[in-house]
From Swiss-Prot:
It comes from Xenopus tropicalis (Western clawed frog). Its main location: cytoplasm. Pyridoxal 5'-phosphate binds at R75. It catalyses: O-phospho-L-seryl-tRNA(Sec) + selenophosphate + H2O = L-selenocysteinyl-tRNA(Sec) + 2 phosphate. This is O-phosphoseryl-tRNA(Sec) selenium transferase. It is found in: Cytoplasm. Its cofactor is pyridoxal 5'-phosphate. GO terms for molecular function: O-phosphoseryl-tRNA(Sec) selenium transferase activity; tRNA binding. The lineage of its organism: Eukaryota, Metazoa, Chordata, Craniata, Vertebrata. The modification N6-(pyridoxal phosphate)lysine is found at K284. Homotetramer formed by a catalytic dimer and a non-catalytic dimer serving as a binding platform that orients tRNASec for catalysis. Each tetramer binds the CCA ends of two tRNAs which point to the active sites of the catalytic dimer.
Length: 506
């Protein structure tokens, strides 16, 4: 309520009580004012009531929620289902206009404020996470692959003769298809093996640039976050090469915001060389539903060019989700999650190393990968060709998600390109292995349960050879111990939620 309404309320209720209520309301308003004025993620989290007040205030600024609105156009923010309307907090118009995803909508002032604030808050988080000189970013309602495509299509207008993209190999389909979809020819640079790690072959990159001609290359497409034993590209050195040959540089930073090491690589690359844009996933870094990404860069004008390349208006759902999430966490809450992730990486590494020693395997030495780990499966691979993939199936049926097994000798054809040793980022990696990652929001309980189930599965797979024929059938059966373990895990979760509710109510 505004001031006059509060004054009028004093005729209905004791004025002292009304003044107290007005002060409570003012506290919410002060938080909103600080957010709008500063455009930064608040240090401390907001409670849900403040967030809902703010979103409702934004919604009533959109024309579809005007009390006397009369819409006669083809797109008037009409929604048939009340449930759908509530799901979106009645913010129906989306973001941007037909020519620019970052443009203001005249009949959706509230949604436009939401869009601008979200972009500003995400930029603040990117800077806090380590890329301090990033100048601009925007949330786009497409996942990482399509967002990379948008960057490549923008560069096409700057380099119309270019047809190649230099790409140090990473065995992940969407980043490869992003180049194909944009109409370019990927030039795959094989990684070099250094110890257990797969690292960028800088000499091969420079040789290809010389061979093809810099003017024929759209950009270098490098990667930070990835599955071990591949490690982040030598972004700093690649940035220097790009600056030397005046070639654009786009970085796939899919889940790198959560890693200070990945963010430092981007910051250093921009400092000593050239990075035009870096793209990161919303769901992997900000714990929201799949379907959004952040495109960021060091030049306001170039980032704006990318936003103008997006055709039509766009869904506001990813922007709304990340806005609510960052307000719920605050900068302090997000930093806490980043710190916990680092701690859990150390814990996961130590537990896998213990298990590897017990089972005569090895945790591969990949010190340059800050998120993913790899456990060798040498003895399992020697046992039989299908034993490695069988382990993956066993883990999945025991409700272990995210872990992936990489057998030897797998080939995959993507858009006519043949990748030998697919999933291992190399034609001939020396051993089969299993991946596990310490990503943001992972808990100690996740690690403990994973190690316990992995131990069981590996011991099953390593039974005497005369039992091997029965293993595929038996291994898939869920035992009473498995059921008891799942029940215990569910009980721990429910107990934790009950404790949280009691703390909140207290």
């Amino acid at each position: 309520m505004e001031h006059e309404s509060f004054k009028a309320s004093e005729r209905l209720v004791t004025p002292a009580y009304i003044r107290q209520g007005r002060e409570a309301r003012r506290m919410h308003e002060q938080l909103v004012r600080q957010l709008v004025e500063q455009g930064k993620c608040p240090k401390e989290p907001w409670d849900e009531s403040t967030i809902e007040i703010f979103l409702n205030e934004l919604a009533v600024m959109d024309s579809n929620n005007f009390l006397g609105n009369c819409g006669v156009g083809e797109r008037e923010g009409r929604v048939a289902s009340g449930m759908v309307s509530r799901r979106h907090y009645r913010l129906i118009h989306g973001i941007g206009r037909s020519g620019d995803i970052s443009a203001i909508q005249p009949k959706a002032a509230g949604s436009s404020v939401l869009n601008k604030l979200t972009n500003s808050m995400v930029l603040d988080i990117i800077r806090l996470a380590g890329v301090r000189t990033a100048s601009s970013c925007f949330v786009v309602p497409m996942a990482t692959g399509m967002s990379l495509t948008l960057c490549f299509l923008t560069l096409r207008h700057k380099r119309p003769k270019a047809k190649y993209i230099i790409w140090p190999r990473i065995d992940q389909k969407s980043c490869f298809k992003s180049m194909i979809t944009a109409g370019f020819e990927p030039v795959v640079i094989e990684n070099v093996l250094e110890g257990d790690e797969l690292r960028t072959d800088l000499d091969a990159v420079e040789a290809k640039i010389t061979e093809l001609g810099a003017e024929n290359i759209l950009c270098v497409h490098s990667t930070t976050s990835c599955f071990a034993p591949r490690v982040p590209d030598r972004v700093e050195e690649l940035a220097v090469i790009c600056k030397k040959y005046e070639i654009p540089h786009v970085v796939n930073n899919a889940y790198g915001v959560q890693s200070s090491k990945c963010m430092h690589l981007i910051q250093q690359g921009a400092r000593v060389g050239r990075i035009d844009a870096f793209v990161q996933s919303l769901d992997k870094n900000f714990m929201v539903p799949v379907g959004g990404a952040v495109i960021a860069g060091f030049s306001d004008s170039f980032v704006q060019e990318i936003s103008k390349m997006y055709p039509g208006r766009a869904s506001a759902s990813p922007s709304l989700d990340v806005l609510i999430t960052l307000l719920s966490l605050g900068a302090s809450g997000y930093n806490k999650l980043l710190k916990e992730r680092k701690e859990m990486f150390v814990y996961l590494s130590s537990e896998l190393k213990k298990l590897a020693k017990e089972l005569n395997e090895r945790l591969l030495e990949t010190p340059h990968n800050p998120i993913s780990l790899a456990l060798s499966l040498t003895s399992l691979s020697e046992q039989s060709g299908s034993a490695v993939t069988q382990l993956g199936s066993m883990l999945f049926t025991r409700q272990v998600s995210g872990a992936r097994v990489v057998p030897l000798g797998t080939s995959q054809t993507i858009n006519g390109y043949v990748f030998k040793g697919f999933m291992s980022h190399s034609n001939n990696y020396p051993c089969a292995y299993l991946n596990a990652a310490s990503a943001i929001c992972i808990k100690k309980q996740d690690v403990d349960m994973f190690i316990k189930r992995l131990d069981k599965c590996l011991r099953l797979c390593k039974k005497e050879k005369h039992l091997a024929k029965d293993e595929p059938r038996c291994a898939q059966q869920t035992t009473e111990d498995d059921v008891a373990e799942l029940a215990q895990g569910l009980g721990d979760v429910l107990q934790g939620e009950t404790a949280s509710e009691l703390l909140l109510s207290g």
